[in-house]
């Protein structure tokens, strides 16, 4: 029986106790306390050897998660993780080195063949540019440079703040010759797809002025508290027609049924010219 991440730790421990004939495997892609250390602006990697997982769990109010994760790692038949970096973290913070490292990867057929690749890339670019034009109320060059970041909504750990700041520096550098559209594809607390944006997309209505909040494709709960939108505003982005660089927040799971782009994540990712993942915490 295979269990992934601390949330399923109770299941692993239950099977271990009640059905000892069934082998148990526990895989972690990170540690809850490591993520918390990094998310609280502490230097995780520079001082890794000095951290005590139990002590930090108490300091950061993480005892329950950390305890479950640690006990699961200690008592399953086989404990695995996905990288050498995380293996070091597990050994230091959970007091248990993984029995084996199973590196993350993709199947050989993950990237489409040449003709299929070109077809999917063109379709993705068409849809991304169409959404941008409808939201911003201005034409976007077909040759625009599309760049994105994505991942869990961990504002600092995943470098979302770094991505926005980098885009802002590029925007204000005065050196841009080519139009750039930057997408932040990070699931947030979504309320629903924007009805105004959905309508103009579905009816193929040409918009000539930016929509309200021309930075986001879906309405959020408590938008005024969203870190991404607040930093975009603080940085001075306007997404006006004269800006060489526009930034758009796509705050939903791209499962093909989000109401706006309606394509799975990987079918959109293929349309990007560059992707940026300035992650601090793996």
Across the structure, where does each feature detected by a protein language model lie?
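Catalytic cores of nucleotide-sugar-dependent glycosyltransferases that transfer UDP/GDP/TDP-activated
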Residues: 1-282
């Amino acid at each position: 029986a295979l269990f992934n991440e601390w949330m399923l730790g109770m299941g692993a421990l239950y099977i271990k106790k009640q059905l000892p004939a069934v082998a148990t495997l526990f895989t972690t892609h990170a540690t809850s306390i490591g993520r918390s250390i990094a998310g609280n602006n502490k230097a995780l990697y520079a001082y890794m050897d000095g951290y005590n997982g139990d002590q930090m769990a108490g300091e950061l109010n993480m005892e329950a998660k950390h305890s479950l994760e640690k006990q699961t790692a200690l008592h399953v038949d086989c404990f695995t993780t996905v990288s050498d970096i995380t293996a070091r973290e597990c050994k230091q913070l959970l007091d248990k080195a993984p029995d084996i490292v199973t590196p993350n990867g993709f199947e050989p057929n993950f990237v489409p063949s040449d003709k299929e690749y070109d077809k999917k890339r063109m379709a993705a670019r068409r849809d991304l540019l169409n959404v941008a034009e409808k939201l911003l109320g201005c034409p976007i060059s077909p040759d625009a440079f599309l760049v994105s970041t994505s991942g869990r909504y961990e504002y600092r750990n995943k470098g979302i703040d770094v991505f926005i700041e980098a885009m802002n520096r590029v925007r204000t550098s005065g050196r841009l010759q080519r139009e750039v559209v930057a997408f932040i594809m990070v699931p947030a607390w979504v309320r629903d797809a924007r009805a105004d944006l959905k309508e103009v997309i579905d009816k193929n209505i040409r918009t000539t002025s930016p929509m309200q909040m021309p930075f986001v494709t879906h309405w959020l709960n408590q938008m005024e508290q969203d870190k991404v939108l607040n930093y975009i505003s603080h940085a001075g982005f306007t997404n006006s027609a004269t800006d060489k660089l526009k930034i758009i927040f796509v705050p939903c799971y791209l499962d093909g049924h989000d109401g706006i782009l309606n394509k799975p994540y990987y079918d959109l990712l293929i349309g990007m010219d560059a992707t940026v993942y300035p992650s601090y915490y793996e």
